[in-house]
């Protein structure tokens, strides 16, 4: 059975109390009513966070008259928090679960994702994290942020430029470019080791890393031979294999979910456009033609779509097209600089950077109802990369 509801295009800080309705967009989703009991302040926090998670899922929506009724009881424990949940429909029980942990937001996200899965069979993204670069007057920070009011956590700070982070499929590493040594070198931060090491430092540019789906290789941009080209990098041996052989600039690679193709940017016709080639190199096929500037491609997890940045009317916006180049759809309309799109792990959301509220920040858009939410806080933030499912 399918349910119809109205979702609004909104802009708000993640975890904020108020959403700002802008443009109503019809979407199909399952209505869920929430009843949260227990400690008053704690229950209020849980109700707000779970409601935000549900409304941003793209599959469910909160409603006073829901197909499913979720009853949640929250309490404090000596070790943190406890949450007992019961979900029913028409009086028939659908799921009963208990959660314990040190952080109430983590429990809320876990329940929200379980609820999405139990009602739809699809994975939720409430428990996932996003990493991005933040620039302040002191320098540059590689930060990771959960989808709630908790502040971002800096995993690396430098007075020199940090850019183009890419989260590994196993969740343990983020590879990024740093100018710490005076050159644009590739570094790798490991969560398990809580440290970063330099992994590639050939003369010139070492940037725009993109992991293969199996984590066995990275597509990177190197300018070791004069102009920028796409190379494959082995993350264990650090050996490189050149894939593009043109005199033009080739950059911003991204793997298809099968790992057999790479989409990238090239200015071989005089301005940046998107091309696709086999992951072993060879002949490329041009994918874009409707805009004079296209960059930053990102392939969806299901392989059906490619998100990218394109210039239109003097401004830069986020677009999505089918993997064959057809069915082009513009996603952003506010601001003048919307770029760096990256897909969430379920393919229902895209993170990107934008100046739509005046300052450059990281946003997320839910593609079913076109709901937009700001994730980053203060400072100039950009270059998001999404964690895989299961990262904690």
Model-identified regions with their sequence ranges:
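A structural "domain/chain start" motif
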Residues: 16-48
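Structural motif
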Residues: 81-82, 138-143, 183-187, 227-231, ...
């Amino acid at each position: 059975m399918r349910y119809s509801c109205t979702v609004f295009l909104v802009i708000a800080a993640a975890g904020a109390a108020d959403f700002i309705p802008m443009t109503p967009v019809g979407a199909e989703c399952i209505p869920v009513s929430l009843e949260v009991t227990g400690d008053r302040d704690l229950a209020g926090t849980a109700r707000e966070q779970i409601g935000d998670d549900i409304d941003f899922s793209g599959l469910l929506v909160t409603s006073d008259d829901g197909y499913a009724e979720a009853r949640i009881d929250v309490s404090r424990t000596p070790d943190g928090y406890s949450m007992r949940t019961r979900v029913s429909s028409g009086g028939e029980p659908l799921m009963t679960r208990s959660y314990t942990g040190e952080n109430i937001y983590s429990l809320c996200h876990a329940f929200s994702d379980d609820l999405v899965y139990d009602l739809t069979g699809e994975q939720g993204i409430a428990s996932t994290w996003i990493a991005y670069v933040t620039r302040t007057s002191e320098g540059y920070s590689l930060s990771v942020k959960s989808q709630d009011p908790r502040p971002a956590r800096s995993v690396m700070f430098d007075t020199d430029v940090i850019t183009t982070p890419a989260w590994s499929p196993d969740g343990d590493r983020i590879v990024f470019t740093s100018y710490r040594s005076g050159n644009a070198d590739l570094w790798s931060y490991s969560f398990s080791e809580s440290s970063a090491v330099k992994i590639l430092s050939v003369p010139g540019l070492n940037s725009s890393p993109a992991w293969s789906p199996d984590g066995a290789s990275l597509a990177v941009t190197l300018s070791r031979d004069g102009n920028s080209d796409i190379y494959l990098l082995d993350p264990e041996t650090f050996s490189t294999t050149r894939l593009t052989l043109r005199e033009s600039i080739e950059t911003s690679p991204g793997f298809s979910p099968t790992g057999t193709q790479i989409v990238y940017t090239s200015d071989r016709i005089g301005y940046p456009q998107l091309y696709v080639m086999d992951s072993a190199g060879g002949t490329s096929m041009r994918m874009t033609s409707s805009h004079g500037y296209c960059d930053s491609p990102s392939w969806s997890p299901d392989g059906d779509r490619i998100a990218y940045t394109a210039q239109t009317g003097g401004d830069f916006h986020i677009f999505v097209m089918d993997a064959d180049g057809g069915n082009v759809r513009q996603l952003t309309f506010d601001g003048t600089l919307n770029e760096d799109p990256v897909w969430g792990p379920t393919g229902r959301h895209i993170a990107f950077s934008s100046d739509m509220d005046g300052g450059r920040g990281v946003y997320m858009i839910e593609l079913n109802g076109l709901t937009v939410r700001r994730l980053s806080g203060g400072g100039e933030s950009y270059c998001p990369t999404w964690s895989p499912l299961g990262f904690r």
